[in-house]
């Protein structure tokens, strides 16, 4: 999903668990 791609960088920084489906 594009939305997850946008937050991918933030996820790495804040270690946010994003469901990768």
UniProtKB/Swiss-Prot annotation:
<keyword id="KW-0150">Chloroplast</keyword>
<keyword id="KW-0934">Plastid</keyword>
<keyword id="KW-0793">Thylakoid</keyword>
<protein>
    <recommendedName>
        <fullName>Thylakoid lumenal 13.8 kDa protein</fullName>
    </recommendedName>
</protein>
<dbReference type="GO" id="GO:0009543">
    <property type="term" value="C:chloroplast thylakoid lumen"/>
</dbReference>
